[in-house]
C-alpha cells in the first residue's frame, strides 16, 4: 500500500474514534441568604467590606484540593432571603440543576422578622415553609442528599447594642436561634435528611465567638473558614467519594 494512502486511512480512522467520556462531576447546590451568598460582610460600624468568597467558595476549594475535578459547587444564596423566598425559587435554583447534594442555609432573616413582630414570620410559619421545601425536594429530587445548616449568632443579649433600632432588645438571642434550629433538626429527621449542627461547633464564649463574626451574624474570613471546614468534614464522612473510571456522563464534549 502506498505510504500516502496508509497515512490517509490512518488519519480518517483516528478522526472517527469515539471521544473519551468525561468523569461525571457531582453537583452541590448551596441555597440560602447573605451568609451563603457572601459577596460582602458587615462590620460592626455598618460598613460593607468585600471578602474573597464565603463558605460556599471555600468549600469548593477544599473539595477541589481533595477531589480534583470531581465536584461542582454552585452558590444560590441571595442577600436578605427568607425561607419563603427559597421556596419560591426552589424549582429554578435547585430542581432544574438536578444536584446530587443540596445544602440549605436559611432562617436568620426569618428570625429577624419575628423579632420585628412580623406576623408572617413566626416559628410555626417557618416550620410550615421548611416542610414545604422538603416536600418539594423529596418529590422532585428523590435521590438527592439534603443537608440543613444550623444557624449561629454572636449577638446573645447584645443585639440592641450592636444593631441599634434594627432589632429590639432581646435578653437571650441564642434562645431564639435555638427555637429555629430545633425546628430544622426535627424536620431533617422527619424527612430523613441531615442536620449540620454548626451551633454546637461555634465558640460558646461571647468574646471568642466574635473572632469569627463581622457583626454578630455574618461570619468574617475566619468564620467562613470554620463553616467550610465543618461542612467539608460532614460531607466527607457521609457522601463524598472518589469517582471510578467507569463513572461517566451519558454525554461527552464535542
Please identify what each model-predicted range represents.
Residues 1-5:
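Positively charged n-region of N-terminal signal peptides that target proteins for export
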Residues 6-15:
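Bacterial N-terminal signal peptides
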Residues 20-76, 89-98:
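Serine-esterase "nucleophile elbow" of acetyl-processing enzymes
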Residues 25, 58-69, 85-247:
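Alpha-helical cap/lid subdomain in secreted, periplasmic
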Residues 37-53, 77-82, 116-121, 168, ...:
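Acidic/histidine-rich helix-loop elements
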Residues 248-254:
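A short, charged, Gly/Pro-tolerant segment at domain boundaries
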Amino acid at each position: 500500500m502506498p505510504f500516502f494512502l496508509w497515512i490517509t486511512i490512518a488519519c480518517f480512522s483516528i478522526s472517527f474514534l469515539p471521544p473519551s467520556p468525561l468523569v461525571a462531576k457531582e453537583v452541590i447546590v448551596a441555597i440560602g441568604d447573605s451568609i451563603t451568598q457572601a459577596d460582602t460582610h458587615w462590620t460592626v460600624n455598618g460598613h460593607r467590606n468585600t471578602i474573597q468568597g464565603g463558605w460556599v467558595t471555600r468549600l469548593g476549594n477544599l473539595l477541589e484540593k481533595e477531589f480534583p475535578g470531581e465536584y461542582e459547587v454552585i452558590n444560590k444564596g441571595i442577600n436578605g432571603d427568607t425561607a419563603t423566598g427559597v421556596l419560591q425559587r426552589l424549582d429554578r435554583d435547585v430542581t432544574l440543576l438536578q444536584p446530587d447534594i443540596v445544602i440549605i442555609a436559611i432562617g436568620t432573616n426569618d428570625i429577624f422578622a419575628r423579632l420585628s413582630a412580623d406576623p408572617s414570620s413566626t416559628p410555626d410559619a417557618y416550620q410550615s415553609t421548611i416542610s414545604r421545601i422538603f416536600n418539594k425536594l423529596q418529590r422532585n429530587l428523590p435521590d438527592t442528599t439534603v443537608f440543613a445548616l444550623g444557624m449561629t449568632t454572636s449577638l446573645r443579649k447584645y443585639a440592641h447594642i450592636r444593631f441599634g433600632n434594627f432589632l429590639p432588645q432581646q435578653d437571650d438571642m441564642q434562645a431564639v436561634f435555638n427555637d429555629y434550629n430545633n425546628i430544622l433538626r426535627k424536620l431533617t429527621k422527619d424527612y430523613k435528611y441531615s442536620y449540620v449542627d454548626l451551633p454546637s461547633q461555634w465558640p460558646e464564649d461571647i468574646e471568642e465567638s466574635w473572632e469569627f463574626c463581622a457583626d454578630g451574624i455574618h461570619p468574617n474570613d475566619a468564620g467562613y473558614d470554620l463553616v467550610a471546614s465543618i461542612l467539608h468534614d460532614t460531607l466527607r464522612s457521609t457522601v463524598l467519594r472518589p469517582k471510578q473510571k467507569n463513572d461517566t456522563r451519558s454525554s461527552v464534549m464535542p
